[in-house]
Design a protein with these regions (language model features):
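N-terminal interaction/assembly modules
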Residues: 1-116, 120-132
């Protein structure tokens, strides 16, 4: 598993958590087919746990930069992609362009073309430090 796959798996965990699941060990390893202890599975776990720990601040950033979209209105898959990406932008000290590109790759696989454009706009606004 590479980092993009780790992001996709983290997005799935965040989505499952949002839909009422617990993102527990069974989901993380058995259902996703991820092996514990691998560098990327550790990264996936760090992303998931970081998003959950910082969910309020992450959602505030998304809501502020989503140009008229409330958190409740955003598609749940798109929201999961955004949450993981915003966590990476804020806490992982990775280049913003790389984080955004990888997040768009995940969105392209799991969401719609319009969603990719929306996610790109929100993440670009956040990366530039702008407000809606």
């Amino acid at each position: 598993m590479n980092r993009t796959m780790a992001r996709a798996q983290a997005m799935k965990l965040v989505y499952e958590w949002e839909m009422g699941g617990n993102g527990g060990e069974e989901t993380r390893f058995d259902l996703l087919g991820v092996q514990p202890g691998e560098e990327e599975s550790d990264y996936m776990e760090a992303l998931f746990e970081g998003v959950i720990r910082n969910i309020e601040g992450i959602d505030q950033q998304i809501a502020r930069c989503a140009h008229g979209w409330s958190i409740e209105r955003i598609n749940r898959v798109d929201l999961a992609v955004l949450r993981v990406a915003v966590y990476e932008l804020a806490y992982c000290k990775l280049p913003a362009a790389a984080t955004i590109a990888a997040s768009l790759e995940v969105a392209d696989k799991y969401s719609t073309e319009k969603s990719v454009a929306f996610i790109n706009g929100v993440l670009g606004t956040i990366a530039r430090g702008e407000k809606a």
